[in-house]
């Protein structure tokens, strides 16, 4: 069934491209139908795990000793199901957006989701590195295609460069663990401490926690539709890796670094998420805040359960807040519920996190971290209220079917989040309810404080927060990178034109000699 789901996503993208000359309504209907089928297939996979799909080892075996390996288990299923839910919600709400997506963009929806699901299913570091690299390459091509200014191209290249560093660290960690006598599986404990550090650093870099960076470039055409996938899927894939690492157990030596990354990201992400009024521009800070919460709940003794819940919350509540536009008073319900989930409402992923923090507090474990995390949860919920208080905008269409599918698109992630929360943990504990109440009190106090705050003071705080921005550093790094690109371009000119044929024969000659020597 995982192969059936992946095949359906591939067929959907191809079908949309074939129908590119058809009416927009037809393309949307086909996209919605395929997304619904993928969502149902993802739901049925709950009855199919655990399952492992193994491909043959690449040749030569002395160079590629790890096969491509996919694993369907509790962790991969819930991330997979959340991703298909985000895809379905994004397509359902697309009918009510004034911007019309082209057939190429619609096909990209399905191809990109398929790559993200492959990364979730990856059971070893080789498979994960390949899927990460494919996602990064596909994203870079799309960003460069949409970039309208040189600055946009510059930001896209640096974002891809940061992600590529994560891929290289992942491969380096796999190599060190292999040299120490271990394997490349992410379901068994690591042998090399250095390998663990590098793999964790790869995940933290792609999450934007170490060093701090603020996600993908913000292009105007990517506000709510495709931008939701590009903002949420890469960090969710990294959180899935982090979940695996907590499942197999982490050395004590890694805890101080993870704690530093979690607290720093929670402070910066939480404050920026509150102060930024536009929910679309503030999405990177939402991702940073939830990712930091995942790290902190994992360190509090909760292990993989809390990280898994945070990853699902990132996908589902992030989709609701990213896709929501207020057209009627009824549309405000779903951002409000999302805010309650973020502060730990029972029977939700946030409630699971609240319960785990409550248990840690009762047992006297990491009290300071627990208090910081509860305040961070309050900040996440408070920032989500920006969407709740947005001004109403008129419907772009008068069709009742469009309004119905839009409402369903906002409701589905929230309802799935509640269902997943009940599936994870049926009964909320008293300590979890206390944490939820505490986060609600902190959030209420913060709301009253911000309401009484003069506008000039809020703008001053916003200006101070804007100084924590990595873009000036990126601009400084752009100059040596551009010089390197010129060198590469001049070297590449040797291979152009009539000289290309000669160089091709030289390369073939070296290959023949190498094979003969082997």
What are these regions (language model features)?
Residues 1-4, 8, 12-99, 103-107, ...:
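Transmembrane helix-loop-helix hairpins at membrane boundaries of multipass inner-membrane proteins
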Residues 22-27, 107-194, 205-208, 273-335, ...:
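Alpha-helical multi-pass transmembrane bundles of energy-transducing inner-membrane proteins
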Residues 54, 61, 90, 197-257, ...:
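Short helix-boundary/re-entrant hairpin motifs in multi-pass inner-membrane proteins
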Residues 62-78, 191-196, 362-370:
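Short aromatic-rich membrane-water interface segments that cap or initiate transmembrane helices
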Residues 213, 310-334, 364-411, 439-466:
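Predominantly late transmembrane helices and immediately cytosolic-facing juxtamembrane segments
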Residues 294-301, 355-370:
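Interfacial segments of multi-pass membrane proteins
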Residues 335-344, 375-381, 401-421, 471-486, ...:
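Hydrophobic membrane-spanning alpha-helices of multi-pass integral membrane proteins
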Residues 426-433, 453-518:
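Aromatic-capped, Gly/Pro-kinked transmembrane alpha-helices
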């Amino acid at each position: 069934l995982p192969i059936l789901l992946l095949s359906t996503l591939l067929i959907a993208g191809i079908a949309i491209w074939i129908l590119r000359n058809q009416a927009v309504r037809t393309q949307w209907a086909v996209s919605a139908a395929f997304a619904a089928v993928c969502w149902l297939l993802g739901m049925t996979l709950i009855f199919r795990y655990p399952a492992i799909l193994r491909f043959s080892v690449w040749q030569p075996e002395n160079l590629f000793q790890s096969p491509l390996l996919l694993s369907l288990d509790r962790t991969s299923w819930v991330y997979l199901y959340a991703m298909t839910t985000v895809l379905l919600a994004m397509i359902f709400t697309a009918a009510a957006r004034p911007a019309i997506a082209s057939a190429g963009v619609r096909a990209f929806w399905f191809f990109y989701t398929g790559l993200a699901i492959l990364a979730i299913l990856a059971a070893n570091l080789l498979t994960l590195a390949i899927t990460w690299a494919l996602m990064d390459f596909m994203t870079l091509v799309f960003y460069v295609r949409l970039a309208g200014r040189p600055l946009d191209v510059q930001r896209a290249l640096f974002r891809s460069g940061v992600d590529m560093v994560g891929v290289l660290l992942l491969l380096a960690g796999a190599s060190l663990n292999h040299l120490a006598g271990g394997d490349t599986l992410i379901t068994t404990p690591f042998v090399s401490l250095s390998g663990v550090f590098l793999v964790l650093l790869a995940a933290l870099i792609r999450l934007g926690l170490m060093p701090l960076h603020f996600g993908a470039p913000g292009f105007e055409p990517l506000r709510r539709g495709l931008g939701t996938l590009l903002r949420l899927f890469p960090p969710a894939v990294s959180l899935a890796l982090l979940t695996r690492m907590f499942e197999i157990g982490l050395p004590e030596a890694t805890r101080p670094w993870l704690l530093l990354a979690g607290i720093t990201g929670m402070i910066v992400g939480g404050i920026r998420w509150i102060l930024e009024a536009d929910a679309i521009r503030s999405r990177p800070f939402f991702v940073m805040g939830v990712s930091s919460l995942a790290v902190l709940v994992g360190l509090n003794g909760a292990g993989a359960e809390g990280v898994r819940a945070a990853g699902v919350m990132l996908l589902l509540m992030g989709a609701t807040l990213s896709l929501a536009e207020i057209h009627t008073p009824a549309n405000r319900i779903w951002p409000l519920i999302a805010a309650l989930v973020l502060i730990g409402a029972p029977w939700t992923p946030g409630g699971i996190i609240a319960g785990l923090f409550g248990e840690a507090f009762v047992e006297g474990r990491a009290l300071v971290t627990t208090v910081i995390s509860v305040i961070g949860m309050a900040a996440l919920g408070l920032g989500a209220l920006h969407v709740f208080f947005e001004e109403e905008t008129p419907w772009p269409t008068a069709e009742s079917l469009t309004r119905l599918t839009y409402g369903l698109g906002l409701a589905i992630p929230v309802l799935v989040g509640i269902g997943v929360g009940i599936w994870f943990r049926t009964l909320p504990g008293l300590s979890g309810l206390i944490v939820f109440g505490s986060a609600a009190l902190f959030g209420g106090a913060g709301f009253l404080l911000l309401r009484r705050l003069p506008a000039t003071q809020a703008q001053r705080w916003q200006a101070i927060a804007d100084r924590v921005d990595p873009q000036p550093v990126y601009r400084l790094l752009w100059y040596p990178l551009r010089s390197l690109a010129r060198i590469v371009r001049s070297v590449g000119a040797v291979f152009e034109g009539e000289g290309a044929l000669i160089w091709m024969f030289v390369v073939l000659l070296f290959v023949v000699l190498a094979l003969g020597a082997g």
